[in-house]
Swiss-Prot record:
It comes from Candida glabrata (strain ATCC 2001 / BCRC 20586 / JCM 3761 / NBRC 0622 / NRRL Y-65 / CBS 138) (Yeast). Belongs to the TVP18 family. Golgi membrane protein involved in vesicular trafficking. Glycans are attached at residue 22. The lineage of its organism: Eukaryota, Fungi, Dikarya, Ascomycota, Saccharomycotina. Pfam families: Cg6151-P. This is Golgi apparatus membrane protein TVP18.
Length: 167
């Protein structure tokens, strides 16, 4: 039995999220996109022969931090220090996430002072996440998790036996 990515994605949850008009969910979606962009574009900018390398390294670190912020389940399964876990748990509200993403976007916009590179895309997508969380904060919307990724407690979630067969 082959295990596909579609077994972990809840299409009905995607439609439910779109209809909710909860901007914290939209911020979370862009957060997922930012994880990949930060790591990929951070690595891509390591090959410049200028100070942009420092911003590329910062981009990679930002991607890893966003990974733990947007996917809190990883805090339970990865061996991390208590100080790091406390730091990540500070960003469990829309207001703090708005501030966090804004500061990270500003750092990436500062890379433009050295050279215009693809890190500009990081600044833009981080800004979109910040704006989404900011709108959710100003509208007093509850912080919500997305329904796109299936919960391990769902009945149709692939369990250990399926993973063992795949391996």
């Amino acid at each position: 039995m082959a295990l596909g990515i579609t077994q972990f994605i809840n299409i009905a949850g995607l439609l439910k999220d779109l209809k909710s008009f909860n901007f914290s969910v939209y911020g979370k979606w862009f957060g997922y996109i930012n994880i990949f962009l930060c790591i990929a574009l951070g690595i891509a900018n390591l090959f410049h022969v200028s100070a942009v390398i420092a911003f590329g390294i910062v981009g990679i670190v930002q991607g890893l931090i966003i990974l733990f912020i947007e996917i809190p389940f990883l805090l339970k399964i990865c061996p991390l220090s208590d100080r790091f876990i406390e730091f990540i748990k500070r960003f469990e509200t829309n207001g703090y996430r708005c501030i966090f993403y804004t500061l990270m976007a500003i750092v990436q916009y500062c890379s433009l002072a050295v050279m215009t590179t693809s890190l500009l895309v990081l600044g833009i997508t981080l800004t979109i996440s910040a704006v989404s969380y900011g709108i959710a904060f100003t509208k007093h919307q509850e912080f919500a998790n997305t329904n796109i990724i299936k919960n391990p407690t769902d009945e149709d979630f692939p369990h250990d036996a399926v993973v063992r067969e795949m391996l």
